[in-house]
Amino acid sequence: MAKQKKHPQGTIALNKKALHDYFVEQKFEAGVALAGWEVKSLRAGKAQLVDSYVLLKDDEAWLMGAHITPLKTASTHVIADPIRTRKLLLHKRELDKLFGAVQQKGYTCVALSLYWKQHLVKCEIALAKGKKDFDKRHVEKERDANREVQRAMRSKGKDD
């Protein structure tokens, strides 16, 4: 028998901007329906989630704005669209929870990361609420204060 190839375990792409712009309330794991050339590109790490979001319509979830750059060696028979909409695969009860929250409570649904789970590509999506500018400044001040405390602790440890 042939030896099984090891698939890379780990993150393909992160959406750091989403963590900066939104308060993440709840996270979900969704499968992604991909074409063959897209999987090859993801193996090469050619993906961006910077301005991506999740559109909920007709009892389905769609990943919008995710950019997967096609490889030069991809198939010439298929015209590769790097920013096409991709279907997200979720359970019915998860979709119902997302629909209810997005329609009533002022939440939005954003993509946080793409990653490998064994040989499958998964997308971590989140139910999130938008941050205001003063919220972002407040988080920045907290980070700076924590950094100062860590510096003080490190320098105190060296003085002993």
Curated annotation (Swiss-Prot):
Domain of life: Bacteria
PROSITE patterns: SSRP
Keywords attached to this entry: Cytoplasm, RNA-binding
Biological-process GO terms, alphabetical: trans-translation
Example of a GO MF term: RNA binding
Localization per Swiss-Prot or TrEMBL: Cytoplasm
Pfam families found in the cross-reference section: SmpB (PF01668)
InterPro entries membership: SmpB (IPR023620), SsrA-bd_prot (IPR000037), SsrA-bd_prot_CS (IPR020081)
SUPFAM superfamilies xrefs: Small protein B (SmpB) (SSF74982)
UniProt region (Disordered), positions on chain: 136-160
One of the record's GO cellular component terms: cytosol
CDD domains: SmpB
Main location group: cytoplasm
HAMAP family (alphabetical): SmpB
PANTHER family: SSRA-BINDING PROTEIN, TMRNA-BINDING COMPONENT OF TRANS-TRANSLATION TAGGING COMPLEX
Job description of the protein: Required for rescue of stalled ribosomes mediated by trans-translation. Binds to transfer-messenger RNA (tmRNA), required for stable association of tmRNA with ribosomes. tmRNA and SmpB together mimic tRNA shape, replacing the anticodon stem-loop with SmpB. tmRNA is encoded by the ssrA gene; the 2 termini fold to resemble tRNA(Ala) and it encodes a 'tag peptide', a short internal open reading frame. During trans-translation Ala-aminoacylated tmRNA acts like a tRNA, entering the A-site of stalled ribosomes, displacing the stalled mRNA.
Protein family per UniProt: Belongs to the SmpB family.
Protein name according to UniProt: SsrA-binding protein
